[in-house]
Every structure is written in C-alpha cells, then in structure tokens.
A protein has these predicted regions:
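Catalytic cores of the polymerase beta-like nucleotidyltransferase superfamily
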Residues: 1-231
Length: 231
C-alpha cells in the first residue's frame, strides 16, 4: 500500500500481480518533483497521464469506454503523444518513461514531441527537477531488455545530455554484461564509466556511496591498467 499516492499492489493466489489506484489528480510543486496527490473524478485522473495511450479507461458499471484524448487511435498507430503542450515542462521524466515504452513495445514519439520537449530541457527547468526521480527513472530504464534503444531515443531527442549530462557510449561493452540481480546498477556504472567526468556525473545523480566507491575503484583499476573509458 502507498497511502500517499493512493495506490496498492495485490498478488493473487495464482500468481497474477494487479496494480490498483484510486481515481486521483496530481499537483507538481515544481517541474520533476514528486506529485501531491488527492482524490478526483476519473476525467481529472486521465488528464494527468503521460501519453494518450495510457489515458483510456472503462467504466465497470456501464462498460462505457472513456477515451478523451484519442488514445485508441494512437495505440493503433503505435504513437506516444503527450496530452498537453506543457506535459514535459510539468514533468521532464515523462520523456524517460516514454523512451522505455517506445523501446519495449516498438512505439515511436509523435512528431510534435521534439518541439514540446525543447522547453523542458532548458537548464533552468532541469535544475528544478528532482534528481532522485531522474535517477530512479534512469535505473528503471537500465533494467529493460531494450535499454540501449531507450537510451538511444533519449540521446536522439537531446534528453540524455540535457537531463543527465550523459553521452551515449558504444553498445558493445553493455552486451558483455549477463542478466543478473543488480544488472541496472552495473549498466549505470558502465554508462558513467564512458563519460568525460564519471565521478562528477555520479555525484550529480546523488548515487549511493557504495556505487560511487565502486565507480572510483573501477576508474582506478582502469588507470592502473593504462585504460580510459572516456569518449
């Protein structure tokens, strides 16, 4: 249960996991911040979603299909379309979640996304975004099977550099990592290793001490071996 956000997760006896959420609305104190949540009608709930494809609902009472933003049309076209012009300014992490969906499901961003995203990538907007949320969204992205495609989409949009100060390294080093527990953290360290100033980026992301120590040890070992990860 997450009372503050009005959400819960239920594991049914036969193994199915169901996420439940109250109909609610969110208010962002500043761009990228954790939202303040309160109960609201379903119409208000849908208008806060990231993209039209996840702004659809079914009224279980009358089985009416609610699709105020053309989500079914965009779903059929495999398009990720934000709901309003300030969607990314309101929450810059929306583009990271969108890149994950696009990479995982073979979707693409709507043609207006680069134009709508540009104001959200301005330094003054990024400076106000929650670094903890940015970090968590990056880690979730690195857990994806198609994580490199998601990173490439973010790089293509200019979001990887603007939001994280990261350049996209070659894919080959990542392919050598085997799937195991903690894989997203290993991918994150490898991603940081290929930056011009890995420790500065790690500090900016406010990584836990154990990860920064691990990165420092990795860098020291590479220096000793006469190697460099910077691109």
């Amino acid at each position: 249960l997450h009372y503050a956000f009005g959400t819960a997760r239920v594991r049914l006896p036969f193994g199915l996991v169901v996420d439940l959420a109250e109909s609610r609305e969110e208010v962002y104190p500043y761009p990228g911040a954790l939202p303040q949540v309160r109960r609201a009608p379903i119409a208000r709930d849908l208008e806060r979603r990231d993209y039209s494809v996840n702004a659809m609902a079914v009224d279980l009472g009358g089985l009416a299909f609610l699709d105020p933003y053309g989500g079914l049309r965009d779903l059929e076209a495999r398009l990720l379309r934000p709901l309003h012009p300030l969607a990314f300014v309101e929450d810059p992490t929306r583009v990271v979640r969108g890149a994950r969906l696009a990479a995982r499901l073979g979707f693409r961003f709507a043609e207006e996304v680069p134009r709508l995203l540009a104001p959200a990538l301005l330094p003054e907007v990024v400076a106000g975004a929650s670094r903890s949320r940015l970090r968590e969204e990056l880690l979730l992205t690195l857990e994806e099977e198609a994580f490199y495609r998601a990173l490439a989409l973010l790089a293509e949009l200019g979001a990887l550099k603007a939001l994280y100060g990261l350049d996209l390294p070659p894919e080959a080093p990542f392919l050598r990592l085997r799937a195991e527990e903690g894989l997203s953290e290993a991918r994150l360290l490898l991603l940081l290793f290929h930056q011009k100033d890995p420790l500065e980026r790690a500090a900016w992301l406010a990584l836990p001490g154990r990860l920064r120590e691990g990165l420092a040890l990795l860098l020291a070992a590479m220096v000793t071996a006469g190697m460099s990860g910077a691109v």
